[in-house]
Amino acid sequence: MKKITTGVLILAIAIVVLIFQYINGDGPFKKSSTDVRGESYLVKRVIDGDTIIIDKDGQDERVRLIGVDTPETVKPNTPVQPYGKAASNFTKKHLTNQRVRLEYDREPKDKYGRTLAYVWLGDEMFNVKLAKEGLARAKFYPPNDKYRILIEQAQKEAQKKQLNIWER
């Protein structure tokens, strides 16, 4: 009888904790968010295929696109990788001097202090566009994986079509 009472007590505590987390939007119930003001930001510069500089309140802010990894072009001590220039040029062509919206996931910054975001150009997520064009690999660092399935599906389409980095 004592084992049953202890089990019920533990279950009740777990339920209370989960309810508290649900009410506060915390723990497993924490959601990603777009910029709370719904503002768009001017892309001032493209660093490489998956990193941009935006103007946020008059300050430059470095933004790393979540869920994609483009071939390197500017990484110190690393040679320019195949399709790196193509990915950088594609991002420059589509985002430079454009206004974008940012959608954040669970962790807003990476260990280098860059803002982590899904970048929206109109109603299209640019992160997906890079993967769909075969200019980026799907790459996720949990817990930032809200659009994992969508980006991985875009990569599979590019692989099937043998686009760019998936060319044989």
UniProtKB/Swiss-Prot annotation:
It catalyses: Endonucleolytic cleavage to nucleoside 3'-phosphates and 3'-phosphooligonucleotide end-products. Its EC number is 3.1.31.1. Its cofactor is Ca(2+). The active site is at R64, E72, R114. SUPFAM superfamilies: Staphylococcal nuclease. Pfam families: SNase. Residues 1-27 form the signal peptide. This is Thermonuclease. The gene is nucI.
